[in-house]
Amino acid sequence: MAMNMSMTLCMFVMVVVAATVIDSTQLQEPDLSRMRRSGPADCCRMKECCTDRVNECLQRYSGREDKFVSFCYQEATVTCGSFNEIVGCCYGYQMCMIRVVKPNSLSGAHEACKTVSCGNPCA
């Protein structure tokens, strides 16, 4: 009987301590919005950010640019924001780069594709 009383008392103390800790911890509303962190987003700024970030990322993969377009596009979407999960930051640019970029031809492909419409809802 003493063992059961001891266990009950121990559990009661643990619950009280847990409730006190949880109650005293300030809950913060996380600001996860990339749009708010980066300032007001508009189509032109998002496109410029996206194309610049993809280009910078692909420069790290010299000679293998054609293999890393999708990877770099996803990385840019995380950095620049996206209109939705499907479109990303500039879908038209990604599709153009996939078609045009060849190993060691990044600057020409970037120049050719950066003027392509993104296909975004407000582009």
Swiss-Prot record:
It comes from the Eukaryota. One of its GO terms (molecular function) is ion channel regulator activity. Keywords: Disulfide bond, Ion channel impairing toxin, Ionotropic glutamate receptor inhibitor, Neurotoxin, Postsynaptic neurotoxin, Secreted, Signal, Toxin. It is found in: Secreted. Expressed by the venom duct. The cysteine framework is CC-CC-C-C-C-CC-C-C-C-C. Homodimer; disulfide-linked. This is Con-ikot-ikot. It comes from Conus striatus (Striated cone).
